[in-house]
């Protein structure tokens, strides 16, 4: 599934879960190429199998439900908040590493789309292999460590002293 967050500054305006993700396109490539899931994802990341039009090929068409559902969430948000337009879409996670996904989102949703493949002002230890630990996977945990949203049961908060110590712990655990 895919989690959509609409954020302005440091305020979460809307969060929705869409029950579609990269599974459909990975399955399509597996069937078409006769490969396993890992190889299919590698092909999607290294070859331009995804274009900007759903009708170009089956792999691109497999994103139709995901993008249509994202579009519905965006339409809902815009209808409820006409004074707060969405300027950009930022992609993270496995799907963000698929070549051409940003162009597909941009054309189909008519919104500027960017892949969050780097973290500004974050320096990694040179020993960390960024090909394995790609920054697109680290955005959520790093964000949660620096600015937790407070989604923790009260009994856990009382044992740890609140969110501040939790944020320090997460930041320390990430190294």
Where are these regions (language model features)?
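Hydrophobic/aromatic-enriched cytosolic interaction surfaces used to assemble or bind macromolecules
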Residues: 1-175
């Amino acid at each position: 599934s895919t989690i959509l967050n609409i954020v302005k500054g440091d305020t979460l305006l809307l969060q929705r879960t869409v029950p579609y993700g990269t599974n459909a396109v990975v399955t399509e490539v597996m069937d078409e190429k006769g490969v396993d899931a890992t190889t299919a994802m590698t092909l999607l990341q290294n070859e331009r199998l995804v274009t900007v039009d759903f009708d170009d090929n089956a792999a691109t068409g497999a994103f139709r439900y995901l993008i249509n559902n994202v579009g519905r969430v965006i339409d809902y948000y815009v209808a409820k908040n006409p004074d707060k337009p969405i300027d950009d879409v930022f992609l993270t996670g496995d799907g963000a590493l698929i070549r051409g996904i940003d162009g597909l989102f941009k054309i189909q949703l008519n919104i500027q789309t960017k892949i969050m493949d780097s973290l500004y002002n974050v320096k990694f230890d040179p020993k960390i292999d960024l090909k394995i630990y790609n920054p697109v996977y680290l955005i959520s945990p790093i964000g949660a460590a620096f600015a937790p949203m407070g989604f923790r049961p009260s009994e856990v908060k009382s044992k740890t002293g609140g969110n501040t110590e939790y944020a320090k712990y997460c930041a320390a655990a990430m190294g």
